[in-house]
Amino acid sequence: MKKFILPMAALSLIAAAACTKNEFDSQNVQNNEGRTVLTVELPGETKTILGDAQGDVRPVLWSKGDQISVNGVASQALDIESNAASADFTLNAELTAPYSIIYPATMVKDGSSVITLPSQQKATSGDNIISGSLPMAGYSNTLSAKMGQLCGILGIHLKAGSQTGLIRYIEVTATGGEPVSGDFSVDCQYCKLSSEAQGVNVIRMEVQEALSTESASAFNVILPAGVYSQGFSVKVVDENGQAMIRNIGGSLELEAGKLMLMPELTFVPNGEEKGVEIATPEEWNSFATAYNAGKYPDSQIATITADLDFSSVSADKFVTLGLRDGAKQSPNGPAKYFAETLNGNGKKIINLKSDVPFIQAIGTGALVQDINIDKTCSFAPWYDGEKQLEFGSLIGYCSEGTVKNCTSAASITVSQCNAVANKVPLYIGGLIGRNRAASISGCTSSATIVSDATYVTDATAKTSLYIGGFTGYCSNPNGVLERCTNTGNISVASTALNIYVGGICARTSAGTIKGCINSGAITVSTGRTSGDPCKFIYLGGLFSVVDASGDEQYLKVIECSNSGDITSNSNVKQLIAGGIAAQLSTNKAEFTNTTNAGNITTTAALRNLFCGGLFGRISATQTLNLSGEPFTGTINIGPTESNKYAQLYCGGLIGQTTADVKVSGSATWKSSLSYVVKATAEDNIAAESFFGGICGCAYGASMSLSGMKSEGTIAIDTLKHTISGVGGIIGGGTKGTSISDCSNSSKVSVKENKAKTNGYSVHVGGIAGRIVGGDVNIKRCTNSARIESRHFNNKSWSSYNGNVAGGIVGSVGYSEGNTFPATIEDCHNSGTVYSLRGASGGIVGYVSKGTMTGCSFTGGITRSAPGGGIAGVANSCVISECYVKASIKTAAAGSTNADCGGIVGEAVSSTVDGCRYYGELIPAAKVSTGGIIGKADDASSAGVTTTCGFGGTINGTPVTTDNLNTHAIGSTTGKRGTFYLWNGTL
């Protein structure tokens, strides 16, 4: 075992001051003595680097992992803690002097005194060199030796011009033909290199770096020391194939250990570099095969120079570009992502029939641009069922890189391509299968995607199918989709357990998506039969599911839009559909100026439905700021499965929320929402259904709504739904709700159905349908539309399963034992209220523990259960400073408890203070009717703290000062206060 102490030579450093275009400056080498210490940057790699400048000298330092060759024997890897100028090397061999030493050992050829200089070099960050790239030699008769340099460095400093892309490579050519790579003999005693090789006079340095316009980047190209008779030619090529060539003429001597610095250059292209030219399918296959085998550097440029017609190439003969572990052409690895430039030059890919993407995978530094996949191309994605796979007609997987100005009009058919049922998720995109962290811009997919009924999944594995019109999956915060479009239609009949379909992207976890548009239609016709694993279908005009998670995951969606229709002809157990996204299950996403104009339609008897013009369901805390008219399409819900567990949640903007959500801004909904049922009384059973112009239902969590306007149409058929809520703004809330500064002019109607049902109730309101389970605040809201419920509930309204209708809200706290307070303040209704077999109020149909102040009603009421100008039924409430100018009439099919009051129809433990009524009260027979309260219990009173006034007629009898006290409260119970005659003048 031998140990050598080796001091390093030092490399001179020169300034760029007085350089001219055709000259280099140089300084003499200075040597540093001492022991060398090396550090490791990446495990298993050597790291010999240039140290910091010491005047005009930069020492070359050993680093951990370095190895030398002594008399053809490699030393052990150096194991030291920090960079230094000398080091002890150990060799596991008995060697005799003299000792010929070469560094690095990896360059030594077959234990000889010959080294191989690579024709490819890599740039490194800063003004430095890649470790292990600067060869040295030494010679000694003792165990201590001093190393000398064999090469010099050509220093190139570059700045970006006005239109500079990422720099692919720098190519240095010895114009006189001197060899700069290949095999060189080493004279270790005199530190000299010699070679007789021909045609190896070019060195390429891979750069893969964007330049700055402010400061120059330094690139150090290592060349054999010697005389270069005609100087050098330097070519700089960017990712777009733009080239700049600078010639350094005359005889130049590059001395060992010298840094020769070119004048600073600004990249100004004066040429074009096409690289590998591809004009035929055969040339494509040849290029892809060679690249996949590692025969091209990552700085390579390839250009498609003619349309490629693959009609004579069978699917099993086509070679995809790049390799992805688990994909067909690399099922068990390794992966090799394309990292070069592929310039499609606007050419078409024609008649390609394949089960793999045109490009399988791209990675860091890749640029793919101007490629058009023609409509004559068709794809049937391959998968083996064992590893997650992504498929796009252009690219399967984008790890990183750039994709620009590409299109696809291909057809993609997802079917059972393999005998093994799929056990892992499959991501399909019209253009891109999955975008991790690439920048994709200006691309269009008009690809048609069909997932037929033969695509089934392993029922035990419970796998998912993701289909996006443009891409299947966006998964990294560094990923970008900008100005991308999908116009292709998607049709799904698969029975995968979970099916996710989005017009732009199926699964969206992170990234920035800006200015993207979908106009492609989505149609699902999956037929559910016994034993099928399919349970959930998620359909989104832009995205199926948005599920960003993790500390660094975040999604930004900016100025995107959908106009593609969503149609479900499936009887699936659960459908979630949204014009922007089916499901929003993260609070790490923001949406700015994103809209939907597409229609949402269901036709088959599905069981559970979550549907919204923007979002089908929101299951994470969210703050949304909406403005303008974010949804202009229609929502048309057809028949649903008759099942006592069925649930329906549909909203003009949001179907259902299950987390705390705040919606604010100044948005207007002007569309139509309809639920049409053609069934008998025995059909259409459901547990609950909620419909609203803005939101269907806030379920199990609070919701805040402000500044929203509803100006559309809501038309609902209901039969045997245990609980239903319909509202111009929100259908229902199960944990309280805050609503402020909202208005409704949408006609809200629950249509007449001849079938009579027992105990299946509907609550309808101009702003909200049914709110329970939490504190309620409704302030500064208005309704001007007709609120109509013709649902025939054969049960009495008073048993907490009756119908309720209100001009502002149908019911608040309509549950036995309610303990939550409600505030309704400064709300006004000028629309009419019609309720068959239900309690009705000009402001609220039923309210518990409410405080109502400063409200007014100027429409009219027709009802067949308790009705009041402010509240149909008030339980434990305080009503003050409200006025009503309206008629209250009785509808057919009335009940015996259709009490009628100008302010409150029926009051339980409630007070009415400072309120006024003027109008016509037309009660049913044998009911209590009063100008202020129709029926009051002993705990209720009117005009206690301030006086109440009323006037008009009661059952045709004019109200006068003589009969005020008689007509103030219709029942004999209740405390009378002070009343005055009011003529309706405000």
Where are the regions that the model predicts?
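Surface-exposed repetitive/solenoidal architectures
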Residues: 269-986
